[in-house]
UniProtKB/Swiss-Prot annotation:
Upper taxonomic lineage: Viruses, Varidnaviria, Bamfordvirae, Preplasmiviricota, Tectiliviricetes
Cystines in this chain: none
Keywords, comma-separated and alphabetical: Activator, ATP-binding, DNA-binding, Host nucleus, Nucleotide-binding, Phosphoprotein, Transcription, Transcription regulation, Viral genome packaging, Viral release from host cell, Virion
Biased composition (Basic and acidic residues): 31-43
Name of the protein described by the UniProt record: Packaging protein 1
Species annotation: Canine adenovirus serotype 2 (strain Toronto A 26-61) (CAdV-2)
Compartment(s) where it occurs, according to its Swiss-Prot or TrEMBL record: Virion; Host nucleus, Host nucleoplasm; Host nucleus, Host nucleolus
Subcellular location, principal: virion
The encoding gene: IVa2
Subunit structure: Homodimer. Part of a genome packaging complex composed of packaging proteins 1, 2 and 3; this complex specifically binds to the packaging sequence on the left end of viral genomic DNA and performs packaging of the viral genome. Interacts with protein 33K.
GO molecular function: ATP binding; DNA binding
């Protein structure tokens, strides 16, 4: 009977110690199979006898891994700090949405009166959802930090993405020419161009003062401060070239063929990176002569043929975001191929609103209205600030950026603002559900 009862036990259990404390215990049983066990009817450890059905042992060799709880029932100090950080962001966004003039048609969201009320009345489900949102915000901030400078500004506009096609929108007097030079001198376009082609309808349209400013600032952008009061060039050229061209010279058929020895762009690309800046050419762009190949086909051929040409940039200045005249389709192709849309807040609000409605379809309505309010604020209170939309950002936090002469290029973190607004909606839904069930309870009680 004892032998049958011991079939379900483990064979490596230690023998009971002897009564004498100085006496050693008997030998431990070893792991074995049926062939070398003194009792041939004993069962093996690995369950090699499937025909014999028995109940599983209550003591398993390896304990099962404990499953994590779906919700935590208590909040530690770190969790409270995370909730407080999210609560501060939430309060700031809620106040901004309430005070902005575009909030008339926006549905007001219910919220707790204080952070203490949120902790005491929120409930485990709500608090854990808010902690998940805060964790995703923290991960977004950590992910984008490696692309930023120590002061939080962006190190570049394109981060070596090629080709770099940008459209600049702004009325007369908003500082477009100064912006173009600042992009070169501030080294926001990498790699720094060794040759800059400045395209205007006529060559004599550029005053000597502006030519001197261009030559000075592109030279400034080619150097960085080095050790012991030295400067380090950022390209293979000590002095970058500034080349003036008319729009007619740009559209010369020879300049489209990269194999043509007279192609000015091919000769420049054989030495290093280049940039093409088109200013005051909006009327010519709207004509019949198509130059869309400069935005897509020509860059790939140039970059493949000349290894030294590690950068190809085209920056086109437009006075109107939606021009009526575009016979050659140049402006339409430019908007499609452009990776950057640099917009002055001085642009007419109707054009701005149309652009925002198109490029913020994936965002909540409140975030789109917030972006319109930001444009409106800078239109009324600043002069030379710009807002940038990046179609292919290196990080989602950089879809929308703010460019200031004082602060540099700063991400606007609209994706994080959307997450904060998601937390506001979650709190609103919880409070609304509780109020609905309270009304239902009182109606049944009567």
């Amino acid at each position: 009977m004892e032998e049958k009862a011991g079939l379900g036990r483990l064979q490596n259990q230690q023998d009971e110690p002897a009564q004498d404390p100085h006496q050693r215990a008997g030998p431990r049983a070893t792991f074995h199979s049926d062939r070398n066990h003194p009792n041939k009817e004993a069962e093996a450890m690995e369950g090699q006898n499937p025909a014999c059905s028995r109940h599983a042992s209550s003591h398993s060799i390896q304990p099962q891994a404990s499953k994590p709880k779906k919700h935590r029932n208590y909040l530690d100090g770190a969790a409270v700090d995370d909730l407080k950080s999210l609560w501060d962001r939430l309060q700031t966004l809620q106040q901004s949405l309430t005070n902005m003039p575009y909030a008339e048609g926006l549905k007001p969201l219910k919220n707790f009166a204080s952070f203490e009320e949120l902790l005491s009345m929120g409930g485990d489900s709500l608090l854990n959802d808010l902690l998940d949102i805060q964790d995703s915000i923290t991960q977004c901030c950590m992910k984008v930090s490696k692309y930023l400078n120590k002061d939080g500004s962006c190190a570049s506009l394109n981060y070596y993405k090629q080709p770099f096609i940008a459209a600049v929108y702004g009325p007369t007097g908003c500082g477009k020419s100064q912006l173009l030079r600042n992009l070169m001198s501030a080294q926001l376009i990498v790699p720094a161009p060794e040759t800059v082609f400045f395209i205007t309808p006529q060559v004599d349209m550029i005053p000597p003062q502006e030519i001197a400013a261009w030559e000075t600032q592109i030279c400034e952008g080619n150097f960085l401060a080095g050790p012991e009061n030295t400067v380090v060039p950022q390209s293979g050229s000590i002095m970058p070239k500034f080349v003036q061209m008319s729009y007619a010279e740009l559209t010369n058929e020879a300049n489209y063929d990269v194999t043509n020895p007279t192609n000015v762009f091919a000769r420049a690309a054989s030495k290093g990176p280049l940039a093409i800046v088109m200013d005051e050419c909006m009327e010519d762009l709207g004509g019949n002569r198509g130059i869309a190949k400069f935005f897509h086909a020509f860059p790939s051929k140039l970059l493949d043929r000349f290894p030294k040409c590690t950068g190809y940039s085209v920056i086109v200045v437009l006075h109107n975001m939606n021009p009526r005249r575009d016979q050659g389709g140049n402006i339409a192709n430019l908007k499609i191929q452009a990776k950057m849309h640099i917009i002055s807040p001085k642009v007419h609000p109707s054009q701005l609103n149309r652009f925002i409605n198109i490029y913020t379809k994936g965002q909540p309505t409140a975030i789109s209205l917030l972006l319109k309010d930001i444009f409106n604020y800078h239109r009324l209170n600043t002069n030379f600030d710009w807002i940038v939309y990046n179609t292919e950002p290196i990080d989602n936090c950089m879809h929308w950026l703010y460019l200031s002469p004082d602060e540099g290029l700063i991400p606007m973190y609209l994706n994080i603002q959307a997450k904060v607004y998601q937390a506001m909606e979650r709190i609103h839904r919880t409070i609304t559900d509780r109020q609905r069930w309270t009304r239902y309870y009182h109606s049944k009680k009567k």
